[in-house]
Amino acid sequence: MKSLALALLVGGAIAAGPQQQVLQAPVDNPDVAEPPLQTIADTFDHLRGQATNLWNDVIDKVPNIMDTITHTPPPKKFNRRPDSEWNHIVRGAEIQAVWVEGDDGEKHRKVGGKLEAYDLRVKAVDPKSLGVDTVRQYSGYLDDNENDKHLFYWFFESRNDPENDPVVLWLNGGPGCSSLTGLFLELGPSSITEDLKVNYNPYSWNANASVIFLDQPVNVGYSYSGGSVSDTNAAGKDVYALLTLFFEQFPEYAKQDFHIAGESYAGHYIPVFASEIMAHKERNINLKSILIGNGLTDPLTQYPLYRPMACGEGGYPAVLDQASCQSMDNALPRCLSMIEACYSSESAWTCVPASIYCNNAIIGPYQRTGRNPYDVRTDCEGGNLCYTQLGDISKYLNQAEVMKALGAEVSTYDSCNMDINRNFLFRGDWMKPFHRLVPGLIAEMPVLLYAGDADFICNWLGNKAWAEALEYPGHAKFAAAEMKNLTIVDNKSKGKVIGQVKSAGNFTFMRLYGGGHMVPLDQPEASLEFMNRWLKGEWSAKSSS
């Protein structure tokens, strides 16, 4: 859903196995820690002193962590549909073989990138079959035939003017959460009721844009693979291939402006995916902006703001007592030193300990309260992911008639895959400094960070802090810009204050009042308001010049 496992995993919470809670309180019994400590010593005695010290700190905090590393999930069961059931199959090898003559008279490939291993299968979804929306729809798979990876997508055309409206790629986070939960829980054309009926959403983001919902990385949602993807950079290659082949099949959409939006762990994904696209000079992807909602992008700057958000300094009453707040303060210096070590080396040997230690010491106190980490105003209901609607969505998407209508090939749909979550963490991906890619993107396009102000796990305080700390040529102007009221301007709620915004050049930060981790769920009118205005270019270097 949201990128929801974010919290789960985030919590330090490495799930030692499917039967365990994602977040576990630190074990205080020193005897329990003895065997893992010996294992660490035996296995990593060749590491330099700093890495060994980091792992010792982790084992002290989470004694059973070694058991979780050795867990290997089974591959998803699937039944591949014959080619005859698909309306179109786009062969990456054929696209890669196309050469054109440039303005300089030299021949070059029509589009860049290694595409020969990829195919795109496309199914025209009958709008009447599911009733999710009346607009034109396509679903299907991107196949990486070399690595046995199959990414599922679902495209909805704009309700307004699809021949001219922009195209948006939506990504949930986790890592390991399906973007179809974003579709049905947040910003898609319909939601799912308790009796598994579709309920029209007047605030869907396809009101004025065509939207692609992508289940990535593999083994998330309807996507599947015999292997796995466990870091953001590897996932970026797949997303570039999917977009390239999709726009090759549908050139009528390729000519439109294209934007990437997502939330939570998409704060990792989006800088990488956008940078991957821009790295190809010859491309058919007309990328114009990126939007990150309640994201995790710069942990070193964001982690110090967990304590203020949990302890009453983020605009809502405190969730934690004074002792818990003090424990977070006490643990912060060590946490930050470990994140700094990760930033310095970007190695799993330093980044994994930082993730485990900081998530348990800094996020753990909040999660052990039973409060919703995605909304400080509510308790957690419906299991680890805290939203009962997720169960309804999973039941709906597991229906045979739904799977058939979409061409889904897996035996079951799950909203979030905790194995993926764990794999990303143990590759060190969690704490890596993906914010370092953002300055290069700001130089090329508008960048928006928006944050619902009731979220704990990727809270607005931390997102505002890293936005203001980011070093790039326009840093001083952005840091000095004032937060101004954000109001509705073009409907019956005209004049209603929905948040605050600060912007300078191509960089914008928004605080959305009353929104949790998933702003479109909690504040649908506000989310469509800022989205429509963003797509029109209201906050950009061009509009402010």
From Swiss-Prot:
Residues 18-123 form a propeptide. It is an enzyme of class 3 (hydrolase). The active site is at 264, 455, 517. Keywords: Carboxypeptidase, Disulfide bond, Glycoprotein, Hydrolase, Protease, Signal, Vacuole, Zymogen. One of its GO terms (biological process) is proteolysis. It is found in: Vacuole. Its main location: other. Its EC number is 3.4.16.5. Disulfide bonds join 177-416, 311-325, 335-358, 342-351, 380-386. It comes from the Eukaryota. GO terms for molecular function: serine-type carboxypeptidase activity. PROSITE patterns: CARBOXYPEPT_SER_SER. Residues 1-17 form the signal peptide. It catalyses: Release of a C-terminal amino acid with broad specificity. Vacuolar carboxypeptidase involved in degradation of small peptides. Digests preferentially peptides containing an aliphatic or hydrophobic residue in P1' position, as well as methionine, leucine or phenylalanine in P1 position of ester substrate. Belongs to the peptidase S10 family. This is Carboxypeptidase Y homolog A. It comes from Ajellomyces dermatitidis (strain ER-3 / ATCC MYA-2586). The gene is CPYA.
